[in-house]
Regions:
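Short acidic, glycine/serine/threonine-rich loops at helix termini
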Residues: 57-59, 132-136, 160, 181
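A glycine-rich helix N-cap at a beta->alpha junction
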Residues: 68-74
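Short, conserved phosphate-binding/catalytic loop or strand-edge motifs used
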Residues: 77-88, 153-155
Length: 195
């Protein structure tokens, strides 16, 4: 069975993900999956190592809650593990400090196309990770997202599904592993090759 688009791939992933997801010590996975699960289907617990459970995540959780997400702390307030009930998010505006980790910003931007009314993200103060934000925007555009800076400190993402396109990832196993992991979760037959 072939996917009709990247959105279908991710939807399939969610349907086959375990209810408890242990990301071990992967901070990027914790941030990105937290946002991803918030717009998906089903109830999940996302957890990690003891050290991961000491790393704050309240900035992202508060932003997701402002968008209407159902995210609760399953342990200590402000830290993983998290209990996430995926659903459609209808709120579209959220504000973050510009000096937070770009991974919080990227996590929100990447789910923007899945939000019912899109996303308007305002960053306050100095934006310290603009180059990383711009990399996220480029990748999103490569997959058909309509996303742009609409002012010096504001980004807008239009609601629309991502599009499946051939995509070249530098032949570096650590970079390519994410794409192979995505395909492996889907239980679909998708053409994937290294060149």
């Amino acid at each position: 069975e072939r996917s009709r688009g990247l959105g279908d791939v991710y939807k399939r992933q969610l349907q086959h993900m375990p209810s408890i997801i242990d990301i071990m010590a992967a901070g990027t996975a914790m941030r990105f999956l937290t946002a991803f699960l918030a717009v998906g289907e089903g109830t999940h617990i996302i957890t990690g190592t003891q050290r991961m459970q000491q790393r704050p995540i309240s900035i992202l959780v508060n932003a997701l809650r402002a968008l209407g997400a159902d995210v609760e702390y399953a342990g200590n307030e402000g830290f993983p593990p998290l209990r996430i009930v995926g659903r459609k998010l209808v709120n579209s505006e959220v504000t973050l400090p510009g000096n937070v980790s770009s991974q919080y910003i990227s996590a929100l931007l990447m789910i923007g196309p899945a939000l019912t009314n899109g996303l308007k993200l305002t960053l306050t103060g100095e934006i310290v990770s603009r180059p990383y934000i711009d990399l996220t925007l480029k990748l999103m555009r490569d997959f058909g997202a309509n996303v742009a800076w609409i002012s010096e400190n504001q980004l807008e993402v239009k609601p629309q599904p991502y599009q499946a396109v051939p995509y070249y990832v530098e032949s570096d196993w650590s970079a390519a592993s994410y794409w192979y992991e995505t395909v492996s979760y889907t239980h679909l037959t998708l053409p994937t090759k290294l060149e």
